[in-house]
Amino acid sequence: MNQSMVRSVGEAVDDAVKQLDFDRLSREYWDQNEFLFIPQFLTRSVVEEHLVPQAQGVKSELNRNFIPGHKKGGSVSYYTVIEKAPRFLDLYRSSAFIDFLSRLVQAKLSLCPENDPHSCALYYYTEPGDHIGFHYDTSYYKGARYTILMGLVDKSTQCKLVCELFKDDPVKSPKHLELITQPGDLVIFNGDKLWHSVTPLGEGEERIALTMEYVTNPDMGTFKRLYSNLKDSIAYFGLRTVFKQAFTPSNRRS
């Protein structure tokens, strides 16, 4: 089925997974130290019809933050996505999508616990200078955490995802990538392995991205949970949003 003819995000995801050349993508993923870029995983028409309106609809809910020398931008947490932008969950919770990811990373992946605000969240670059400095998506779980990023809106020539592959590899030479994530483009990586940043947004530009997180073990120690919550409240979603849900039962799904 052509994605342009689908009636729902779920149908589009199922169709997209079926059309992937898995063997080629698997080789690329492992050859690039657990990093993969898939242009147009979902078509622009599907993204702009079903997903972009929901991302634009929760702009008023975003929490803006500024950490001098590291980060400036806005974020909408998983909790708001659940309540006000549920179409994103049709992708995040898709069994076909999770099965594909599990095969790709060669590990059984689960959704993050329901009290993780990063599980399925939106990131907004809407003001000049919005950016994030180089970092890893470090896993505080008792296992690996994988980040999947999808472009939603990219009206920018300056705001790019910058990746440094093999940064800590003692044998291979580093590989520098600069990516513009168009609507429907997908980036998959092991959070502990990819050193990455987003360059500053220019005047009159806009960039919105969806980020989804999956884990091999949804358990997290008490101290690491507290540290993770503090970091998320300061750098992303705000104290009220994070700690309102911090001790809510996980109600895990897999």
Q: What residue spans do the PLM features occupy?
A:
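Non-heme Fe(II)/2-oxoglutarate
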Residues: 2-9, 13-104, 200-254
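Soluble, non-transmembrane catalytic domains of enzymes that act on hydrophobic metabolites at membranes
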Residues: 61-62, 176, 192-199
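Amphipathic alpha-helical surface "interface" segments used
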Residues: 72-77, 122-123, 230-235
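A general structural signal for short secondary-structure boundary/capping elements
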Residues: 82-86, 166-170, 193-198, 211, ...
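Catalytic core of non-heme Fe(II) oxygenases with the double-stranded beta-helix
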Residues: 89, 99-193, 205-209, 216-225
